[in-house]
Design a protein with these regions (language model features):
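Catalytic core of soluble alpha/beta enzymes
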Residues: 1-130, 137-155
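Expand to "…catalyze enediolate/carbanion chemistry for C-C bond making/breaking, isomerization
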Residues: 167
Length: 167
């Protein structure tokens, strides 16, 4: 617990430096297995919340499947879960994961990997527009511009089509 407090306090310090912006830290610790990871993030979240630090913890490692996402969410292991879209096995599971997080007061980050395709990014944009996660990953690629433009352009297409349907 002593090391957890030190990590939380350091994260709190970083949160102060980041002000006025909110700081989200993905995977501040990486434990040896799912259970240990969940417990560590749960303990970190409690300290961060109790001390009202300007930081949110994003669960990533050991939180891969729909079952994992529900497990971390139910245990409040972090403030947000990174939903790795390629790992969930189907669009239905991505939708369920986002909606589960939202209905259980857990932030949802519709993420993925940098080696996805432009088509998977476009499909994920549709899922995001339908489900409203707190954050989405601009993908594919490691650069910023390409992923941002693919996702942004697809979202603009969705909004334009929606507007046409109103007429």
């Amino acid at each position: 617990m002593k090391i957890t407090k030190k990590i939380a306090d350091y994260m709190g310090h970083l949160g102060e430096i980041a002000k006025p912006f909110k700081l989200r830290i993905e995977g501040p610790v990486d434990m040896e297995q799912r259970e240990k990871q969940m417990i560590a993030l749960k303990n970190l979240r409690k300290i961060v919340d109790d001390k009202k630090y300007n930081v949110e913890i994003v669960a990533d490692e050991w939180c891969n499947t729909l079952e994992d996402i529900k497990y971390f969410t139910d245990n409040k292991a972090g403030h947000m879960v990174q939903i790795k879209t390629p790992d969930l096995g189907g669009i239905n599971n991505i939708v369920e994961a986002i909606l589960y997080c939202k209905s259980n007061n857990m932030g949802s980050y519709q993420g993925g990997t940098c080696n996805e395709t432009d088509r998977s990014a476009q499909i994920c944009a549709h899922i995001a527009m339908a489900t409203g996660p707190d954050q989405i990953l601009a993908k594919p690629g490691m650069g910023v511009d390409e992923g941002m433009m693919i996702v942004y352009n697809e979202m603009q297409r969705i909004l334009a089509l929606d507007k046409l349907m109103e007429v």
